Amino acid sequence: MAFLSSTLHSLGIFEKISRIKEVLKNRLLDLTKRRDQAREQQRKRPHTIIQGLLLWSLPVSWIRFLWRQPGEFPVTAFLLGAGTGGLLAIGLFQLLVNPMNIYEEQKVVALYCLASLGAIGWGTSPHIRCASLLLVPKMLGKEGRLFVMGYALAAIYSGPAANLRSNINEVIASLGCTVELQINNTRSAWRVSTAPLRAVFKGMVGSKDSLNKEIQNVSTSFEEMDEQVKSDAGYSSEDWDKNRESTEMFGTSRVRPYLSTQMVYELRTRLRCIHVVNKAILSCYRWFDKKHKNCMRRIHLPLFNNMICVPMKFKFLCNIAKVIEIWCYKRIPVEGNFGQTYDSVNQSIHGLSGEFSANINLKEEKQSSMVGLNTTNWEHMGTEVRDYVRQQETYLQWAMGLLHVLLSCTFLLVFHSAFSYMDHYNWDIRFDNIYISTYFCQIDARRKKLGKQSLLPLRKAERKTVIFPFKATIQAWEMRYVIRELLETLPIVLLLLVLCAIDWALYSVFDTIRQHSFVQYSFRSSHKLEIKVEGDSILAKLLRKTIGALNTSSSTDVETNNMPCLPQPISLNARDYFKASLPTLLLVCLCLAQAFGYRLRRVIAAFYFPKREKKRALFFYNEFLKKRSAFTKLRRAAIVRRANQQKAPPHYLVEALYRRCPLLHRFMRQRCVVCQAMETPDSYVCPTPDCKALYCRSCWDDMQRLCPVCTPREELSSSAHSDSNDDAVYGD
């Protein structure tokens, strides 16, 4: 045994065992001390409701972790904080960044950055954790309302505004379609009505070669007639010159008369007639001469032959033919309009002798632009209107994308507001220090137990300057901010109501137009034209080739309607109106919940900074004690002002209404000059003749039964005589 003991001593086994015992003993004492501290913490009265609820509901180990000292559980605190911060950052990414219209690579980079910052911040800094939780009540404040207002505007745009614009675009497209339909119907009617005439023209143009052949035949035939008219046969040139000179002698003018075709042809016909008469006389002369010679040749007796052949000498009988010349002058067989007809036919024949050709020219007249559209072709009006509508929708979609980006950026204001509140909470002891907290009540109860001056219950006038965080109603101090926020929300509500009303009204109008604007277009036309040209002459053939082309018949029956052009308005159902108004209703609810959200800010900040909360509550209590001691003097200026307003004579209209309308008496009662409560039968009126200030019973007791209006300043309880400028402010 001695050897074993010496061996163990030489190896230092006993020293190591003793050291292990010391370490275990110290750890056991430390655990016992911490357990005692936890039990003492549990036995100690909590300073906040949150602390009390956590002590009541959580196990001891969790309580030790939550209210740990600096440096305790560093690894656990970092891991839990990093995990929580990373999850919150991912949720924030899904809410703000993921809806953006950006590249996926940029979204991945933003996700990694947000998750890293959230994990590091929550794992290392309580200020980051506090500011992150402050986002919840800040979302109920004006910053959150700004964020929700963007979604409200987006919902209004995507709901009634988008539907309103869609219906207006539908009507614009309907107008363009109607104009295009009318133009097409007019064009179709014009084409149908002019189709026979165009067919005639095309037929004439198509029969150009045959017409040219017929015209050449007519020209050839007319040349023979023209040669006959212009021929000099049947008379001698001497007769022509002699008769022409005699014709010119009839003219009284010195100017050589113009011989028309009619006169020339009559002259030539007359000369031919006279020439025939003269030839007849000459033939008669020759016949008598021939017969006289034959007679003389047959009768050889000289005397007898002269006597017997004497009748053959009666050539004067041939002059009887001169009588016919009178007929040549008086009854010449020439029509009176032959010359004019000949000239017309001659001119026509020479005109037809040219090549027959026809061209159809269409002239297009461009009208001015219509309804603001720079249309260059009526046929494309509907297409241009639809393109214009699509272009406007593209611009609006781009604006909506920009609005979504701006909405995501507005969340930065919420972050800034949360950090700003935390900084003001830690550095400005008066900032948002108007709450009657649990620790405030504990201080007052402890002072009351020690017999010192206490503050609770507060006076009636004092209750309007503080906030009781456990009351479920909106208090006077909070009400002014709630009313202001509701007034700021009123334009959004009015915009929603006006757009919904306009959308419903326009839908009703457009639907009525659609139901009662159906138009049926009917176009019916028929014709049958038949021209018969009889005869086998050249002119008849020519007329059959030309005028005969008019022998056409057609029957047209066109029916169309404006059903494709009628507007098809879209109406919003109850679900659409609810989706459009839900963000606006949420905005109004946020205005009402702002007071409770602002109370939650102080609770979160007090949980992370309990020592700072104790200092703030103690400062607020001491400040309240000072104000209580000088309550009368601090409120004197406001009391005197209200008393002077009550003594002022009312407006004559108000006085007349007061006399004539007994029902208005309850609304026109006077108020307490301290707390502004309505006059009751228990109210006290100052008996001083020139004062007559009204007090409720509780305020009169708080004034120690001294009227600040008519009591000299030196007799009041303090030397202060004006409102304090160092009051705590409400953290807006």
From Swiss-Prot:
It is found in: Cell membrane; Cytoplasmic vesicle, Secretory vesicle, Acrosome membrane. Glycans are attached at residues 184, 217, 346, 374, 551. Residues 1-46, 98-107, 416-489, 598-732 are cytoplasmic. One of its GO terms (biological process) is innate immune response. InterPro entries: CSR-E3_Ligase_Protein (IPR051856), DC_STAMP-like (IPR012858). Its EC number is 2.3.2.27. It catalyses: S-ubiquitinyl-[E2 ubiquitin-conjugating enzyme]-L-cysteine + [acceptor protein]-L-lysine = [E2 ubiquitin-conjugating enzyme]-L-cysteine + N(6)-ubiquitinyl-[acceptor protein]-L-lysine. It holds the Pfam family DC_STAMP. Pathway: Protein modification; protein ubiquitination. The keyword Transmembrane helix applies. Disruption phenotype: Knockout males are sterile despite normal mating behavior with ejaculation and vaginal plug formation. DCST1 and DCST2 double knockout males, but not females, are completely infertile. Mutants have no disturbances in sperm migration into the oviduct, acrosome reaction and zona penetration. Mutant spermatozoa are capable of binding to the plasma membranes of oocytes but fail to proceed to membrane fusion with oocytes. A zinc finger (RING-type) spans 672-711. Signal peptide: none annotated. Keywords: Cell membrane, Cytoplasmic vesicle, Glycoprotein, Immunity, Innate immunity, Membrane, Metal-binding, Transferase, Transmembrane, Transmembrane helix, Ubl conjugation pathway, Zinc, Zinc-finger. One of its GO terms (molecular function) is ubiquitin protein ligase activity. Interacts with STAT2; the interaction results in STAT2 'Lys-48'-linked ubiquitination leading to its proteasomal degradation. Interacts with DCST2. The RING-type zinc finger domain is responsible for E3 ubiquitin ligase activity. This is E3 ubiquitin-protein ligase DCST1.
